[in-house]
């Protein structure tokens, strides 16, 4: 995996980007990314994840995520609007943007006021996929910059390492036969 951080003009917190090549078909990677409820199994410090409107489908949908705080920092949460599209070159792009009006502020957490992230899934051949994660956010509340930047540096590496392990599970590796009906339907919308 290749990892990059960058300064964002006007912000103290760095943006990050992680790039890896997975020994898995793009269908499997996409099925994993679309399985919102399973995100805590592979996304660094994700405590819980759920769809806010499961009937909306995966082209445009809303999620609620809770990210575990590192002591002594409180947990963070964010409601996001996500969309998925296929580019002319075949890459599939899943984009998420924080939307404060999707869900009232919860007492459990500090609300993340700004977050933008993109997953780009690109089939290299039948058994290999390039996966690119880019994220820029503001963690909200009072948070020491060194903690925020430490998490920003660890998140892409640890998340991509966990994706590499998780995508081997039958629900994703064999999405067409052992995956959920929802996962099969979702990946079936795209050309690989």
Model-predicted regions and their roles:
Residues 1-192:
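Eukaryotic helix-grip
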């Amino acid at each position: 995996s290749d990892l990059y951080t960058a300064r964002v003009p006007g912000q103290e917190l760095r943006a990050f980007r992680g790039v890896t090549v997975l020994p898995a078909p793009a269908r499997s990677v996409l099925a994993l990314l679309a399985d919102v409820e399973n995100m805590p199994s592979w996304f660094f410090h994700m405590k819980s994840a759920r769809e806010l409107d499961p009937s909306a489908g995966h082209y445009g949908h809303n999620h609620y995520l809770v990210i575990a705080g590192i002591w002594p920092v409180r947990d963070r949460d964010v409601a996001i609007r996500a969309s998925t599209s296929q580019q002319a070159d075949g890459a599939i792009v899943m984009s998420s943007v924080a939307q404060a009006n999707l869900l009232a502020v919860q007492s459990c957490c500090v609300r993340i006021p700004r977050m933008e992230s993109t997953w780009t899934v690109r089939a290299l051949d039948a058994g290999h996929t390039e996966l690119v994660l880019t994220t820029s956010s503001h963690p909200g509340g009072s948070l020491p910059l060194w903690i925020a930047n430490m998490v920003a540096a660890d998140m892409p590496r640890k998340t991509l390492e966990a994706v590499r392990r998780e995508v081997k599970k039958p629900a994703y590796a064999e999405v067409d036969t052992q995956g959920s009906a929802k996962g099969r339907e979702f990946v079936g919308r795209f050309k690989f």
